[in-house]
Amino acid sequence: VRLSDEQLLQLRFCDLQLKLSGSALERRLQHIYGELQRRGIGLRPHMWLAEEWFSPDGIPGIAVPFYLAHPRLMQLERHQMKQVEGGNANWLRRILRHEAGHAMDTAYRLRYRRAWREVFGPPGKPYPDIYMARPASRRYVHHLGDWYAQSHPTEDFAETFAVWLKPHSDWRRTYAGWPAYDKLLFVDELMQSLRDVPPLVRSRVHVEPLGDNRITLADHYAAKVARYGQYPPSDADALLRRVFTCRPARVAAPRASALLRECRTSVATAVALETGVDRYTVHQALRRAIGRCDELQLRVRGARRTGLRDARTMLVKLVGLLATNRVTSIKL
């Protein structure tokens, strides 16, 4: 029986009766094991279903969000959050490499090494609710969105590890001349020293597993939307309102966010070439524009071709704002 969104939201996580073992999702997740093996790393992080992505302190494993276990739940996630984190193969592997970095840190107690702390900073530093990112900084790698490596020393390590682990990663050329290069070189040398070394921490505990979770999906999404669902007002709003519209007469027009999502690759590539700004920053600008278009309920003003042209012009200006902005605040 296919349940409506309203019916699904009334269920508790434990009512979903989802299983990872033997599933198609498990086979997709295990791709990370091959990447680790090719690097000579003996760790195989165990995985389990939970509310969200995380790798718990003290446990060298990876919690995987429940919605990836079923297409209908992925659809619900998209309806609620406008996106599915890890919902395609490339995004899934990027997240897994990041979480594998956390698992490596735990399994080999890396953060307790003096050299690690000298490179990445104090691991005991409190996690901020909001971190101040510097988009133009070259002291950090670019992997997940929102300059995530800048949020905390342990995230800096996990992001650096992820860039290093990626198959055919050309990090030596990409980051040549960046201070972040020294971090990658440190990770490369550290991982070479750990080749075929068994993990020190081998716990296989599942933290906050889905089967024990009695929270309803409605409560889960209410909290998640409150925390992540809104992009704050920004300098971009004036640009977006100039290109798109929220006039009642255009309610039947395509959503601006849908247009930007549809053409994101081609527009981002063109803008990166035109401005000379790195593709990572361009994609962050576009992602934020899409989020604000959703919040402001903006629509395409005229013909689709005109909308695409104006969107490209808008993104060029928005990238300029972001690239020259010394600090931008981001909610964790």
Question: Which residues make up each language-model segment?
Answer:
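Metalloprotease/metallohydrolase-associated module, dominated by Zn2+-dependent proteases
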Residues: 2-7, 11-20, 27-36, 40-45, ...
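Active-site recognition of the HExxH zinc-binding catalytic motif
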Residues: 90-110, 158
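Beta-strand-dominated extracellular/periplasmic modules and repeats
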Residues: 114-115
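A short linear boundary/processing microfeature
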Residues: 110-111, 122
